[in-house]
From Swiss-Prot:
It comes from the Archaea. NCBIfam families: L13_A_E, PRK06394.1. GO terms for cellular component: cytosolic large ribosomal subunit. This protein is one of the early assembly proteins of the 50S ribosomal subunit, although it is not seen to bind rRNA by itself. It is important during the early stages of 50S assembly. InterPro entries: Ribosomal_uL13, Ribosomal_uL13_bac-type, Ribosomal_uL13_CS, Ribosomal_uL13_euk/arc, Ribosomal_uL13_sf. Part of the 50S ribosomal subunit. The keyword Ribonucleoprotein applies. The keyword Acyltransferase does not apply. One of its GO terms (molecular function) is mRNA binding. This is Large ribosomal subunit protein uL13. Keywords: Ribonucleoprotein, Ribosomal protein. One of its GO terms (biological process) is translation. It comes from Pyrobaculum neutrophilum (strain DSM 2338 / JCM 9278 / NBRC 100436 / V24Sta) (Thermoproteus neutrophilus).
Amino acid sequence: MKTAILDLERLPERGEVVINAEGHIAGRLATYIAKALLEKPGLRIVVVNAEKLVVTGDEKMVVEWFKRKISEWGTHYNPEKAGPKIPRRPDRVFKRMVRGMLPKRAESGRRALKRLRVYVSVPMELLSRKRLVVYEVPPAKLRMRPLAKYVTLEEVWRQVDPAAWEQWKKAQELWQKRLKPS
């Protein structure tokens, strides 16, 4: 697996680009990806390690914001039935961020969103590829302030939906055991 710096001007017009999202600010990476999807109609983008994306702000404030958004649309009888569905998993949260930056009523925006894949960690089908280039977004474009407060999407997910997070964590541990040579 090879890594390269992602530059919007030098992206291929067609094909697939794999972006490692580890340690990047979620909103800034989402704008970068939305712009690339709109400008290059033949390009497919795959984002891996979505759980390691960073949201700025105090952890308590960010988690409370997510919990409030989820609870204000739910009902006691059926919490998932009323109102818009608020994503809880990091991959779906990030895809929803990118969707908000695309023109969803225009055909170009709908097509662009279909060309985006977001994964929590790195899926096995990507690891098994022989010639895989994982792109890193340049840190100058996604700068993080020192001494600022940050929280990863995995930590938010752990507090908003602990049962799903526990299940994912157990599955990750099993995969790691399986991948280790005996």
